[in-house]
């Protein structure tokens, strides 16, 4: 078995950044996270096997990178046992598509060898699932990890993709070639360190969950103009919009322009199933109040039609509290109208 360990001196988020973002998702959390990625000989949990695990954990107040690579199929069980021991002090696993592939695959292999799952009682942060809402906002061509890194301007990958790694590993088993082993380990290293690089993209989610302060507001007669301050620095600037709104983001600031209709704005509501939409009035009414309206004049509201209108008044423009209330759900609805890139 090939075993590697090295400290990570740069290119990985600092502890405070990881604490901040993971703390937004998990309240009971002792900050013993592990970033990890696995390499297998195929997708099937029953007819293929695990041959490599790469992980980043904390040791002596420093991020450290670890790898365990099997030199033959018989070493799979040993790697599984080592990783299980490694995870004993961990309370949060961070991965990319780990909830759908890595963890279920590992649990199946642990079951095969009669080993208790090390994932029991541990929390999981799957960056693929968590960052998926950003696809249209950031104009991402795909949600593959290299595409996320490309958005961030990271273009220094030099090793083969995962599918090529399977071919390389089979070649390694035949030839025992050290150069081939380094290629396989290098790919896994890039994947695991890439988790740290894209981790900062969690900052964009603050736009969705209302974690910002409104610092400026103006009405120019046609548009509501707002500036928002985020609690973190965005890793890459962005811009996007359509005929209804336009927003840009850079560093800790979001600039937002929302088109009004005769000086009025739409206020969206989350619980759309509790409302009727009235097409003739272009507004909604609670079902509890609208049951007496003729069915010809009402429809079940949808996410896109569950809104009322209000005037962009001086009172609204002078109240950051009202502006925040307006944006809390409306902004995510507006972002939801953006089209995914072709």
Task: Please name every model-derived segment.
Residues 1-48, 58-342:
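DEDD superfamily 3′-5′ metal-dependent exonuclease/proofreading module
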Residues 53-55:
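Short beta-strand scaffold segments in enzyme catalytic cores
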